Amino acid sequence: MSETLTQAAETLNEKMDGGFDGSAKFDITGMGTIMLDQNGARVANEEAEVTMTADAETFQSIIEGDLNPTTAFMSGKLTIDGDMGTAMKLASAMA
């Protein structure tokens, strides 16, 4: 398990304070996946309502608040596969 992914999951848990109402997966290219749901964030690769894929730099910028997820999507740095409504709820929860 990557230390970087574990730290990212911890950062997301602090930022989101208890998860969100839905299930989402961040697929960080070449590194692995982080699941987010009502139980919070964890390093795992499970079924989700939406999968968001980005490189490590983009993902880091999103979780640190330096890059808005919507901006990342519109610029092609973040791809979304699945329920767009869930992706929007997650973006709001991360704000």
Task: List each language-model region with its residue ranges.
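Feature captures hydrophobic
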Residues: 1-95
